[in-house]
UniProtKB/Swiss-Prot annotation:
This is Taste receptor type 2 member 40. It is found in: Membrane. Gustducin-coupled receptor implicated in the perception of bitter compounds in the oral cavity and the gastrointestinal tract. Signals through PLCB2 and the calcium-regulated cation channel TRPM5. Keywords: G-protein coupled receptor, Glycoprotein, Membrane, Receptor, Sensory transduction, Taste, Transducer, Transmembrane, Transmembrane helix. Disulfide bonds: none annotated. It is a multi-pass membrane protein. Residues 1-17, 88-98, 158-195, 273-276 are extracellular.
Amino acid sequence: MAIITTDSDYYTHRYEVIIPFVVSTIDCIVGIIGNGFITVIYGTELVRSKRLPTGEHLMLMLSFSRLLLQIWIMVEITYQLFFPMIYNHNAMYKLFKTISVFLNYCNLWFAAWLNVFYCLKIVNFAHPLFLMMKQKIVVLMPRLMSLSVLVSISLSSFFSKDIFNVYMNTSVPIPFSNSTKMKYFFKTNVLNLAFLYYMGIFIPLFMFIMAAILLITSLKRHTLNMESSTTGSRDSSMEAHLGAIKSTSYSLILYIINALALFISMSNIFGAYSTWNSVCSFILTAYPAGQSVHLILRNPGLRRAWRRFQHHVRLYLKR
């Protein structure tokens, strides 16, 4: 059984707390504004019309899950840096980690379904299974999203058991001094953590990769058809393929980086106030923020809504 034990001082230098907090706060503010904006736009449309197209409904759920994730990360960082006695209580520590994993699972599932949905809309194959999925995806998507949430709850619940343990020692001697200090010790079962964590992200990551492969294969076939029948210039179908491939690749690469950062952070390989742990915190807060900006920039409707929002903000500030 692979166990990693690390420690964290109760008393730390001020810069070790303030700098990571400021950087993470900036990331979180950007992410909360971006994901909150998308959630409000599509949420308002859902209330007004009582229903949304499947793609917009997926974007609503994805942005809402990222908004919750961003808020939760901000709360966790605040407690970790400024209220360590509360955060490092064994039950509270497990609660923070379990909810973080659950929100990350939901985030990945919704992003995977969004990419699969647009892949099915763009790609054309004659295989019977593919044609059936293309016809049924709109009807099945609400059930698939609900199933994804249930799977995320089930898998993340295991993280509240025998993976993390925190205990405190109030009488750690200070070298060259007669006094003592308080230290928190973290024990992490890395084998169980790795097994459960990667088991939870395997299927949606596989869906991401398959969507990218199908898009690339379809684009290659479409390009060959164009070269044999026309001058080879781009058409709307090729533009749609290229846009979907770029978006899927961007999301996949960012999520892999985010997944590695989350695993390193939860495994407690580095100390709570170490440089590498601060880098992981920066990645975890920057990922939802960057994805929200990406969604707004690639969607014409959201871009127009964002310009209107900026216009209203400027008018308000001029009053």
